[in-house]
Amino acid sequence: MQEKLKKLIGDNINFVFVGEAGSGKSEISINFAKWLVQLQDKPVHFFDMDMTKPLFRSRDVEVQMEETGIICHHEKQFMDAPTVVGGVNRLLKDEDCYVVMDVGGDHIGARAIGGYAPKLNKDNTIVYYVLNAYRPWSNDIDHIDGTLGQILGVSHIQLGKLHMVNNPNNGITTTAKEFIEGSRKMSEMVTPYIAVDFACVREDLYEEVKDSSDVPVFPVELYLTYPWLQNDLPNGQPVPGRG
C-alpha cells in the first residue's frame, strides 16, 4: 500500500478533494490522510472546508482521525453561517508537512477554496475530482462536464491541475458487482478526455475487486456512518467500517 501511494503522489505535498455532493469525497479524504500518516515521513494536516451540510462531515469523526495521527483543522458551524478555517495559507506553504483539504460538494462548497487558488495551482499540489457513477450528476459526460465547469469557475482551479478518482458506490450496501460495473462505466466516459488516477472501494470488498480495474484500487475504511444506516442492510448486519 505504501509503495503504491508513494508512486501515486510523487513529490506533491498538498491534496485537495472536490466533486459532486455525495460522491464520497469526505470518506476518501479521511482515508487518504490516514495513508499519508502511515508513510511516517511528515506530519499530516487535515482541513475540513465543508460548509454545505450538517451530516457526513469529516469534523464529526475528529477524535477517530486524531487517533490515527492526523492533525485536524475546522471551524464550528452555526446554521448556514459561513466560516473560514484558519492556518490554510501558512500550511500550504510549509514543505515539511502534508495538507489534505476536504471541500464541500458542487460549486457551492468549492467557493470555500477560491481564495487559495494561487497556492493550489502550484506544482506541489494535486486537486482530486471524485467521481461516482451512481450519483445523478455523474451518470453521463455532459452532466460531469457541467458540474466540473461550475466547480472550476468558483474555485479558480486550473483544469490542468485536476486528477480524477473513481469511487463507484451506492453507500454501505454497495456490492462488488456494482463497483466493477460503475468503475467500467466511468472509465469509458472520462478516459477519452482525462486519465483516472485511482479507484476506491469499501475495504471489505477490496480483495474481491482489486484486480478488476485498470487503475490502482485503494481500500477505504468507512468513518462517516450512522447507526440508522443499519436499517438499509439485510438481516441486521452491522454497518461496514466504523459504526
Locations of regions flagged by a protein language model:
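Switch II (G3) loop of P-loop NTPases
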Residues: 74-78, 96-112
